[in-house]
């Protein structure tokens, strides 16, 4: 019953009571009581004539009173003076009402809070709503010490400035005023008691920070204000708040942490605002939230992690918003949600797993959306809703229902499909819902063909007839008839008015910026207008460029075929996705397969590696990054391969997610070209960067002092390392080196060769190497000792004077017979000419005698590099020297694959020269190589020559000192029963004409004799036996200067050793196979065999050319 009815009943009851009591009167009174007075059974309880009395309530409302009735009964506990014209209160009229606790002065003409006098301290509830109060003054309220409820609604209060006095107030209502500003701390004196605060329908536009320090407040209402933004921590201090209502404020922005501190709040109502997005930022801290009402907003997006802090939510209202899609993360984390209301949105897309996490959901309201495509074409949209009881899908423009549309809804009890013009339902579309109790379906558009025959029987079996109103629209004979009135035989399939897809769109790949088209066709027997649509990733394409065609196609009757072409211009990466065509008419829609479009773009570099020069030991950093679609893979190569020295040593680092390639502790072997390759399915691009490593100069080998005999060749080594390769300069005794015709530099000044050394050459030689990083110096001391005396004058090399140099020749003393106990050393000094002998794979030059090159150029790291011929500048500055070899002799190749290269000094550089494949093209190791030159260093060098045979065979040649031909004898030990044959076969004799014709004229010969000795006759390690005379001679080349012509009589004759007696040589011809092949061409060549005391002499003619004045001479040594 309403308030007016209650008041009427109360008044009627009061009149009856007054009339009855007035007639009865007290016993013996003899008359009536005072008119207008109410008396109870125990005593008289007077009630003013203008009021109504009911229990402890005195109701004087709606009497147009301008002053209080007088007198008021003292028993009044509740006094209602609302809806009068009171403008002031007479305190004297209330002073005797000591029991008064509740006063209602609503809708009067009061302009201030009235003073009720002494009884104010007893008042618990004071209602002053609907007056003209414009201020709340603390002094006006101080007397109400027991006040618990104060209603100041519907007044003219415009500001809340002066703080409330300390009261026991629990309920404060200041609704529908003109409050536009509030002072922080205004309610602080009510902090311990206030439970409910209502500030609805005011003009509040902002809430000041720390406005509400009310730890006991449970309910706060701010509806219908003008709050547009809510800053973070706005409601801090309301730790006990249970509900907050901010409806109809026009809120557009909720900052992060807007509701932080409301950890106990359970209900939040934000309906009728302008929020556009739900994010976890403004929901932060709402850990106990149970209900969230967001209807009538403009929400169009739910961020993936929005519900991270609201996982206890049980009811969510999102009705009347702008949601168009529900993604698989839209409700992630809401496992306790019981009711979800998304009605009256624009939802057209529901992801397959959109509801999968809602395991407790019981009610899902999706009414008045556009999810027809989700129901018609997708399966599993409602999977995961294991406890769903009610599903409302009315008004969603659903036209057909597939068999899998409601997969997973096994517990559904209520399904509402009303308001949809459903045309077809696949067989057993509802069969999996075993607990279904209500199915609401009303449609008049059904296609009553053979595929719908199951529906009437199933509805009847489940007693759903009262909820289903369905009639046929096709065929024409059944149009308008209820499906329950059509016999099963009436559902036939004579045609197919619903479109049937005949041409499916095809999956494609395209380059960014190109044009793409998809084609789709469908056929139908109906002439109903056809509509075409395209979807991308299950969402309708708006404003798509389409071309639509229609034509007749005969196939057992007249059929119409419809074709739609989707054209995509200048495709971008955002164009990627799955495209599907939807062709519809009045009878339903058909959906094509989904064709995938992939957009590719050739990679392009955003960071290109740059050339880098860095010191050894530092860290190299190369950057490389590329973009493309799909994202390109970055790969690195070094010098075209994947062999990284830094990788083997675990000094290389490539971060998969980084753009930087690191090499720590850079070394010389890291030098090279590094290639960065970016590759994807569209192609690949590469960029190169050169890494240069700088290293300070250093000595790769220790500097060794040298001791040579006067007249010998001295070779000083300074093998330099560094990057860039250092420049070398030699000084002698801390002074610039005076370069003479006897000084030669080789291998980039790493070798200093002094020919025909003299005592004046002795001293301290300093090698200074320098590059851009620094300078390094080292000293070598050269000692020159006088020439040792020899037993035979024939062993002494003829002297050379400076005027006789035509070719820089080297005459080396060999076969020195010294005191018993001194070692016998076979030493060969060989300086080869610059003309390359073709049998050693060296190109011959024409007639000009130039110095030969060092066999292999030594790089700064001491490794063998390519040959470099030509002139180089000496470090002294102005003087130029030709790069020459420390060995000047010929190398005699052995064509059966065995051979050895010998040199004329004891330097390691000569040993390295032996490994040059251009000079010694054989296979194997050399064995010991004996170097002549230093009489005090007879030790052999064990050298492996990659191109030489493993059979150590020595080619010994005589040095020609004058223009004659002399006959030399070469001795070899007799190792077996056939020494001559084996020794002669072991000597690598050259092709006689090929070797000699390149240097000497064919009209002169040279005889060589070989002695075959007993095995004990020669010992390389212990020296000669007494009485054994041997010679070690070499056939020398030139350095480009003419030799002085020596005296002919110096070698005119030679003595036969006393122990050389004729011995039989088994009658075998021991000449070289090559010499045999040349015997017919050169009849001057002859072989002479003699055997003397187990020694054989092999004599062969060499045609040699030294100078035009050379005379042939036959000499026996």
UniProtKB/Swiss-Prot annotation:
Biased composition (Basic and acidic residues): 1083-1093
Protein's UniProt keywords contain RNA-binding: no
Transmembrane regions: 810-830
Signal peptide per UniProt: 1-24
Annotated segments matching region Disordered: 1019-1093
Residue span(s) of domain Ig-like C2-type: 499-598, 603-692, 697-783
GO CC terms in record: cytoplasmic vesicle membrane; plasma membrane
Domain of life: Eukaryota
Disulfide linkage: 520-581, 624-676, 718-767
One Gene Ontology term from the biological process aspect of the record: otolith morphogenesis
LRRNT domain boundaries: 38-74
LRR repeat extents: 75-98, 99-120, 122-143, 146-168, 169-189, 193-214, 216-237, 240-261, 264-285, 288-309, 312-333, 336-357, 360-382, 387-408, 411-432
LRRCT domain mapped to chain residues: 444-495
Bilayer topology annotation: Single-pass type I membrane protein
Tissue expression: Widely expressed.
UniProtKB keywords: Cell membrane, Cytoplasmic vesicle, Developmental protein, Disulfide bond, Glycoprotein, Immunoglobulin domain, Leucine-rich repeat, Membrane, Repeat, Signal, Transmembrane, Transmembrane helix
Glycosylation sites: 156, 274, 442, 469, 688, 729, 1014
Recorded phenotype for the gene knockout or disruption: Mice display circling and head tossing behavior, due to a defect in inner ear morphogenesis. In mutants, fusion of the canal pouches starts earlier than normal and involves an abnormally large region, leading to truncation of the lateral semicircular canal in the inner ear. Nevertheless, hearing seems to be normal. Mutant mice also display craniofacial deformities, and especially a dramatically shortened snout.
Subcellular location: Cell membrane; Cytoplasmic vesicle membrane
Main location: membrane
InterPro entries (alphabetical): Cys-rich_flank_reg_C (IPR000483), Ig-like_dom (IPR007110), Ig-like_dom_sf (IPR036179), Ig-like_fold (IPR013783), Ig_I-set (IPR013098), Ig_sub (IPR003599), Ig_sub2 (IPR003598), Leu-rich_rpt (IPR001611)
Function: Plays a role in craniofacial and inner ear morphogenesis during embryonic development. Acts within the otic vesicle epithelium to control formation of the lateral semicircular canal in the inner ear, possibly by restricting the expression of NTN1.
Subunit structure and binding partners: Interacts with EGFR, ERBB2 and ERBB4 (in vitro).
Name of this chain's protein: Leucine-rich repeats and immunoglobulin-like domains protein 3
Designated gene of the protein: Lrig3
